[in-house]
Amino acid sequence: MGSIGRWFIIPLFAVMVLNWFIGISFAELNGLMPRVQGGTGQYLLAGMGPLPSLIGNLSAYVITEILSMTAEITLCGLVLKGLFLPHVDNRIISIIIMALFLVINLFGVDIFSKVQNIVVFLLIGSMVLIGLIGVCKLGISSNVVDYAANAPTFEQIGGFKGLCSYAELAFWLFIGVEFIIPVAKDLKNPRRDVLLSMTIGLVLLFFVQSILGIGMTNYVSLDILANDPAGTPHMTYATNLLGNAGRIWMGIITILAAASTINTVYASVSRIVQGMGEEGMMPSVFAKTNKRGAAWVGLVVLFVFVAGIIASGLGATEGVSFLLLS
């Protein structure tokens, strides 16, 4: 929003439609191979062989999601330390939260889905509400920005070419639409629910991001949104909107977002490596499950690996962010 203002909603909508077509493809593949554990990796295995499948799974999912999880849980620990626990090391907070979600996922997909439903409901509800307050200009601050007076024109953003260049950025807001696939076999009606869940998720994300973006442009100038001195334009918006209460609320939203990512990565990556173990692309120990059907080896290895990165302090460095964006 900071670079091209509300024009960003156009590439956001276009990318949502493109991701819906991707969702249709995944739903069709799931219909053809409904019992696979690893999802994308086993689709690649059937179509291209073991080596592309191994490389694709590790590079596109396992490594990327480990780095994503590290960044999210580190941010979550920093926010909790800053808001509620100033005297506790943020690394300890992060590892405790990771351990909590490890236990939740060890109880199987039923507990995972119940926790995820609660987290997502609170997250989406909070984002919509804080966005609508901004859209309707109901904040306690009198510092309402006159967006129309400073809005960039179609020519200033580079026209159609400029809009297309921001589609790449918009794609990041829809990453993970296919993460339903590794747990699809545990659904009661996967033929219906796989595509339906992806469709609902995409529409909700578009709606929430649009509302939040419009709200932000009413209380924060485009220059600050693009180049916030603190590097946290969402916190600046919340503070301008509702003062210290807004800052705390946005901090809680940040924690909920991290919790959702952590929970999803645990569930999806453990199932992906389980599928790879079943196909002989990973040690067979990864294919083992506990009595509740959870791929416990993958879950524990994921916890140990990420906890080690966090404990070493690497999770708070720019290196993780650089690798993640790369």
Task: Provide a role label for each language-model segment.
Residues 14, 83-111, 123-130, 144-146, ...:
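Transmembrane alpha-helical segments of multi-pass small-molecule transport proteins
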Residues 7-12, 53, 90-94, 98, ...:
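Residue-level signature of transmembrane alpha-helical entry/exit and packing/kink sites
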Residues 1-9, 75-91, 110-120, 249-252, ...:
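Transmembrane helix-loop boundary segments of multi-pass membrane transporters
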Residues 1-93, 201-204, 211:
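Extracellular loop-to-transmembrane helix junctions
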